[in-house]
């Protein structure tokens, strides 16, 4: 009675169909029905899932509240079947609860929407998510950073092609259905536990189921706090390594259990034989076993959903630069290292979870074996059922571990293939970089060659500009020379002026001669008059002396008579007349002196004119001398050209009987003939100009400026004919004769000028 009053919930549910089935199974021992989840457990589990959906990791909830939830649900009959209408014979192992018909609304969906996993670590960079529930991602801000990097991130080409594991579609059915292994259940299962839970390569995600109105929607677990027994710290900003690393979201513990609660649940009671505490502990153990079984089912569903991924997420390889390829390779290596660290941490977490499962099973075994008699049969039956289900789950877990190990091997093979491809890509990048460097060197050499060519062209341009400047200066000097050259009218005027000046010069010379003769005559007359003046002066002196003597005599002989006075008066008159004559002669001498001065001035002017004429004649003589030297040089050059022409003609005559010359030599000979013809024409023009200037004629301006008539191009083909060569020789001989005539005329003119200069000097 005490036990019945202490567990009223068990008694109240005795009339339920689940309790009837249990009593029937205990009495008959032939049929077993799978347990069903109680309503209180479902409400508690929905509360846990709501906490998980909100992104909270049971931090705000206290351990006492969770413990009260567990203790309040301990009175409910937790040994009720999940599928109440499925019977399994005793001779076989109990099948999994996931093996029910897919037509049930509560069963897991077979499509990829049953478990919607977002991409881990790539939601920000790639912006791709599975077409599932985006609300779970939005509700938890740390999900995008806490998603696990899948092992097959490196594709076939060594780049990030596919972010989902490449599992065939034929394994999808294997993930969804479970085969019942043919093994019998026993009470002692430590060896099976050690063999099945000792594999550290187990990888699985344990999403938190969220009950809705008609079906259970499985969502991703949020970040949890530090798991009991592990050194990993789960933060909201993403998995940061603490002491033993981070854990993926699928391997986190249930959000409804905190650290204190799990330690309270799994630790043995200090007084196991107290009936009230044993009942609470058994209820918590049963609830924990239900949680483990549900997590295993969810793991199987999750793995079945993970095996089906579309292949349309594999992006094509972009055509990038070598530097971008190198950065991509470095980032891929970094991601592979991070994935290896995550795999190691997941293995550690799996081993810790296996250890916890072993401890929980040992506690359950100890609690069930140490339970007093009132619930012995029911507990033994329930324990056998749980052991059968546990063996089945262990077999499924072994199959899963084998499949995951095979998948790991495939991923390692893909990783090795991707590493080989990365190595090939690196080698190709090295080759391309070498090619680019070689091409860069070639381009630099080309640029240097072009720079040299440009510098040479600049130098040539500078030389040509200097030559053009010199030519421009030459043209300016020629223009000045042409401007200074007199025209025909100016030349005629200058010749007329020269003739007039020569006539004036002759007239002035004649006048000078006349004036010189007149001057000589006047000088002679002046001399005679001076002699006369001297004689007159002497006579005057004699007369003055005689006068004095006469005066003396007069004084002595005043009284000698009047005859003497008459004589004196006559002599005085004679002296006056002589004095007047002398004055007249002096005036005439002054006039003659002034005339001589004017004649001297005119002679000085005439001498200046003669000096200017002499200088002009000297200039003309120097110009004639320069022309003679130029004509001599031209004659020498003409002689050399004639000799060269003759030698070339002889060579051509010698080469014609033998073999015909090459086209290059023929072209050169043709060009030489053309140059000789142009030189011959220039020499003829110079000779004509010099002869015209020597003869006093006006030169031909067209010849002086070098303006030639254009030669007909047909004459270039006739240079090799003997008639043309003979005619050219005659022209050269005529030119030589003209040069000789010019030389003789220049020498005659020079001799004449020299004679005139000597006569004038």
Curated annotation (Swiss-Prot):
The keyword Phosphoprotein applies. Residues 1-33, 95-117, 226-279, 435-472 are annotated as: Disordered. It is found in: Cytoplasm, Cytoskeleton, Microtubule organizing center, Centrosome; Cytoplasm, Cytoskeleton, Spindle pole; Nucleus, Nucleolus; Cytoplasm, Cytoskeleton, Microtubule organizing center, Centrosome, Centriole. One of its GO terms (molecular function) is identical protein binding. The keyword Isomerase does not apply. Residues 433-475 are annotated as: Required for centrosome localization and for its function in the suppression of centrosome disjunction. The modification Phosphoserine is found at residues 16, 140. Residues 333-656, 723-749 form a coiled coil. GO terms for biological process: centriole replication; chromosome segregation; negative regulation of protein kinase activity; neuron migration; regulation of mitotic centrosome separation. Residues 435-454, 462-472 have a biased composition (Basic and acidic residues). Residues 14-33 have a biased composition (Polar residues). Residues 256-432 are annotated as: Mediates interaction with NEK2 and is required for its function in the suppression of centrosome disjunction. Signal peptide: none annotated. It comes from the Eukaryota. Its main location: cytoplasm. One of its GO terms (cellular component) is cytosol. InterPro entries: Cep85/Cep85L. Keywords: Chromosome partition, Coiled coil, Cytoplasm, Cytoskeleton, Nucleus, Phosphoprotein. Belongs to the CEP85 family. Acts as a regulator of centriole duplication through a direct interaction with STIL, a key factor involved in the early steps of centriole formation. The CEP85-STIL protein complex acts as a modulator of PLK4-driven cytoskeletal rearrangements and directional cell motility. Acts as a negative regulator of NEK2 to maintain the centrosome integrity in interphase. Suppresses centrosome disjunction by inhibiting NEK2 kinase activity. Homodimer. Interacts with STIL (via N-terminus); this interaction is essential for robust PLK4 activation and efficient centriole assembly and for PLK4-dependent cell migration. Interacts with PLK4; required for CEP85 to be able to drive centriole duplication and cell migration. This is Centrosomal protein of 85 kDa. The gene is Cep85.
